[in-house]
């Protein structure tokens, strides 16, 4: 077993080797991604690297069941996404993506809050560069800058929380944090912003779809799931996460149903699925924590598959709206099948990975007698089938004949989708392959007759509801307003209004000072006789003091008010 070799090192080495002439840069990155994945499989549980820094104990490297599971899926999806991205012309995007992945792996292997924060900020920089590298999209620059601002805000909040927490607790080791002081709440807020929790959830749908066909796949896997890891590590059992999770679940469903853009549908679906994970973390039992971890693992796989199928459509047609595509199953059958498998997995269809993972969270709520939470999770499962399980494949691959006849995407893209499709089914049929990675040895059997029948009935009625409501679900060329309107448009309007008010008051005070100046000058001219000579000039001290007093009073009023 391997103790101290950090998987991120090989990804960073891959980036360095891309600057060497005569090397095939993409194959070099692919090779180092493979090495990093193989290394993650052999990380030794209990391995750590400790360091003393400014009277604090830093733990730069910590391997346990939770962190190793996340490292395995992070390196695995990096390898598969790299296969998918072999046709990506921008080497800058791939370098940025590997920096991004390295930072995410560093974050989940950090055993202290300072190391976590450093990797957290590097992750924000890397992901921003992934978005900005899509120079063919005129919207990517502004979306990337908004994305960066939101994550810098989250980073500042997290930094203040960590500094305050360290000053009180005299300890920065990253373990379960109690919400008994304001600084722990700030740390929680920093994590939730990156998780895509309202009111900042809009950054996911604002930024991810503006990346390239391959960049979106990388982005979907790491930022929100690193936050899920951090919440598991620091705030498992915090009831407030249940409520945040439920809001995210239904927020994602509603906006995904309203959306017309293919990848924005799937971006809102990310928020929805992370909401399920937050509910599991908030419940805080061994079963629900296991469920949150496995669901994060499975979600990375099937969400990447869905985004790869959507990216393949966009890559081959240059169309990204549901209203512009349809009937693509005729010429893109493999992409269609892979997209359907991803849709079934996200819908928790039996024999797929979503069924064996999400059900642990739902069952965790039932076992804790959280009846209202259980009902909402069941209803939300039907909602997921509506927007991602049926809407996405129906409008993109079936429904109308758009007249488009694109070919299948390049073979490397097909290979990546086929691998992910296989994994969705593999973990659905053999869930113990995933369960053996979990931190808690909690027996869970997903395939009971009651559970399978109930889930099939739920999906059947949700499917019927979709086709009954189909006339109302057909998309038009509309724009969906989200919370980001508040800072994209509302904040700008507010600042412009403030600027105008300040400008008007500046003019008013300027006129007032001019009037005072004229008044004082007149007093000086009257009091100072220039005709009798310098030696005979005299000054009326009382008038001068009066004028200065008026000026001082006005100056104080301006300063105070």
Regions found by a protein language model. Give the residues of each.
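Transmembrane helix-loop-helix hairpins at membrane boundaries of multipass inner-membrane proteins
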Residues: 1-97, 171-176, 202, 485, ...
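Cytosolic juxtamembrane amphipathic/interface segments immediately preceding
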Residues: 56-58, 323, 400-404, 524-537
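Membrane-helix interface motif
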Residues: 42-51, 164-171, 346-361, 426-443
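Aromatic-capped, Gly/Pro-kinked transmembrane alpha-helices
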Residues: 436, 440-451, 472-561
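Hydrophobic transmembrane alpha-helices and their helix-loop junctions in integral membrane proteins
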Residues: 80-95, 101-116, 126-412
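Hydrophobic alpha-helical transmembrane segments
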Residues: 65-74, 190-191, 374-383, 449-467
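Short aromatic-rich membrane-water interface segments that cap or initiate transmembrane helices
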Residues: 55-70, 177-184, 364-376, 445-451
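Hard-cation-handling environments
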Residues: 409-460
